[in-house]
Amino acid sequence: MELLRTITYQPAASTKMCEQALGKGCGADSKKKRPPQPPEESQPPQSQAQVPPAAPHHHHHHSHSGPEISRIIVDPTTGKRYCRGKVLGKGGFAKCYEMTDLTNNKVYAAKIIPHSRVAKPHQREKIDKEIELHRILHHKHVVQFYHYFEDKENIYILLEYCSRRSMAHILKARKVLTEPEVRYYLRQIVSGLKYLHEQEILHRDLKLGNFFINEAMELKVGDFGLAARLEPLEHRRRTICGTPNYLSPEVLNKQGHGCESDIWALGCVMYTMLLGRPPFETTNLKETYRCIREARYTMPSSLLAPAKHLIASMLSKNPEDRPSLDDIIRHDFFLQGFTPDRLSSSCCHTVPDFHLSSPAKNFFKKAAAALFGGKKDKARYIDTHNRVSKEDEDIYKLRHDLKKTSITQQPSKHRTDEELQPPTTTVARSGTPAVENKQQIGDAIRMIVRGTLGSCSSSSECLEDSTMGSVADTVARVLRGCLENMPEADCIPKEQLSTSFQWVTKWVDYSNKYGFGYQLSDHTVGVLFNNGAHMSLLPDKKTVHYYAELGQCSVFPATDAPEQFISQVTVLKYFSHYMEENLMDGGDLPSVTDIRRPRLYLLQWLKSDKALMMLFNDGTFQVNFYHDHTKIIICSQNEEYLLTYINEDRISTTFRLTTLLMSGCSSELKNRMEYALNMLLQRCN
């Protein structure tokens, strides 16, 4: 039962033991005999740093446990004293103990290796190599190396203490994990592993027992006993090392260990988390190796399609067919599913409850009503152990089909023209919405109406508003007419207009808490709140426009807002300050204010896995593409439609749509126009 419990460090108890030990004098050993230990093979992996098996070694006495290690340990080089606590795990060469620095009560996981166990040169060389590799690593998701020292009896390696032990312990208690948990842990493993590979270090022993969990439920990749430098293919070592169930075909065939071999092990880890057993586990090792060489394993029907596809890609027999770490994190398994920002410690032994808090639940309740309202849905989206209402089922369905978009941000303070803060919960549509035309343009797009002006109490109010619908339909009709009739061309037309209009230069998705914020080119800041209300702070920073519904505008001073709007004005100012301080403009278009034009405010915004779409009250339509920061803006001026394209270098070009209709454009622009139209057409599906 001890293995099933979440182990939490209790400083008071350890300190008391240390005081008792100090009372007996430094170096005093406990004479109390230990109870017999079970065979090592019967224990799950526990150590913070597994050690390769040692060659047989014989003592005159204490042949199994070795000489007793002192309770108080002194570092000869610094004079620091440490108190040795309980055993955390054991490997071939060493045992891992809880160890407390008596000067500051900091707790470490100490790997203690008797000199007698590494007496042969090649054994000592392995320990030195592990220390050399591990001590240079510094990453949030890699077990931190702190210090090492030696005395006459032992070598001591002080590592980051992970109070909640390893993923092996969690899976032993839980049997299987839910998909959201697997995404949560895998993201962190991929992050740590990507760092290792960037340092040209192969782990070579990825498995549940080598992923350690700290007090905050953060995962750390540990155990560098088998780690090695990445070598060119022709110079790779042909040795077979690692844990049998996780070995890749190329390692078994002595073709060398590369980054792809770590990816294979990651596939085994994902499979084990979801199903509770490794993919190639059989009754004997010979059969296991045969299955691995043939990449032969069963894929239960209980797994959802994205999980099956990702596992299958990582367990490709040919190393070259396996995905990169970047490919893994961009896979539909991550993009289409809910990933919690954090996990409760209760997840170590209990299935988590991912029910939403009230504010977020209300937002999803509205979205679920809009998308699923009035439909009899007999499908089950919740595991049988969860008793939920139909409302919760719909909400879960939205969450389950979630898409989170990741944007690579520049390291500087002023990162990009747009920042995406993936909310704790995001919603997306899976499936393939139909477009009412024989020649559907582009592929179906997975997305969700993330923000719409006005109340969202029903689908008709939320998605079918006649004014909003007519704005969208007009833009879609014009864009579609251009795309379907313009000729093929290899380049962008030479005509370039010099004109001014308003467009979104910066945006922030903070819908996990408040709503969606944006800044226009005239420096107006707007927020479309989660409750459907819209608020704008004008460029003078003194005047606020508030829209509860389309066309219903209230105007008041920012410093003297009506009581019911004070909190929203505070949020509006927060968005304004954040974008001013942290984001830079997304293009080179001039910033001109035309007081004759109506005030722009956001009607609707949507996000897919590739782009953000924004539709405004005057028909201005903007689509920002995440991967290269290109943008398309369509607006009308003097009864004529204009299209502006901002390229990867933030250089803008503006055309009349009639010019594109006559001359055509490059495939680079056309593809983006098609995708933008598809988003617009599917906005209500």
Swiss-Prot record:
Domain Protein kinase: 82-334
Induction of the gene: Directly regulated by p53/TP53. Negatively regulated by miR-126.
Lineage top rank: taxon: Eukaryota
Positions with biased composition (Low complexity): 43-52
Effect of residue 92 to S: In a lung adenocarcinoma sample; somatic mutation
Domain POLO box: 503-581, 601-685
Sequence positions bearing Phosphothreonine: 239
Key words, A-Z: ATP-binding, Cell projection, Cytoplasm, Cytoskeleton, Kinase, Nucleotide-binding, Phosphoprotein, Repeat, Serine/threonine-protein kinase, Transferase, Tumor suppressor
Gene Ontology CC annotation, any one: centriole
Regulation acting on activity, per entry: Activated by phosphorylation of Thr-239. Once activated, activity is stimulated by binding target proteins.
Posttranslational modification: Catalytic activity is enhanced by phosphorylation of Thr-239.
Compartments it resides in: Cytoplasm, Cytoskeleton, Microtubule organizing center, Centrosome, Centriole; Cell projection, Dendrite
Catalytic activity entry: L-seryl-[protein] + ATP = O-phospho-L-seryl-[protein] + ADP + H(+); L-threonyl-[protein] + ATP = O-phospho-L-threonyl-[protein] + ADP + H(+)
Catalytic residue list: 205 (proton acceptor)
The enzyme's E.C. designation: 2.7.11.21
Region (Disordered): 21-70, 406-433
Free-text comment about domains: The POLO box domains act as phosphopeptide-binding module that recognizes and binds serine-[phosphothreonine/phosphoserine]-(proline/X) motifs. PLK2 recognizes and binds docking proteins that are already phosphorylated on these motifs, and then phosphorylates them.
Subunit structure: Interacts with NSF; causing NSF dissociation from GRIA2. Interacts with CIB1.
Additional facts recorded: There are indications that PLK2 might act as a tumor suppressor: PLK2 is significantly down-regulated in a wide range of acute myeloid leukemias (AMLs) and B-cell lymphomas due to aberrant cytosine methylation in the CpG island located at the 5' of the PLK2 gene. Moreover, miR-126, a microRNA that negatively regulates PLK2 is up-regulated in AMLs, suggesting that PLK2 down-regulation by miR-126 could also contribute to leukemogenesis.
Function comment: Tumor suppressor serine/threonine-protein kinase involved in synaptic plasticity, centriole duplication and G1/S phase transition. Polo-like kinases act by binding and phosphorylating proteins that are already phosphorylated on a specific motif recognized by the POLO box domains. Phosphorylates CPAP, NPM1, RAPGEF2, RASGRF1, SNCA, SIPA1L1 and SYNGAP1.
Name this polypeptide is given: Serine/threonine-protein kinase PLK2
Taxon lineage: Eukaryota, Metazoa, Chordata, Craniata, Vertebrata
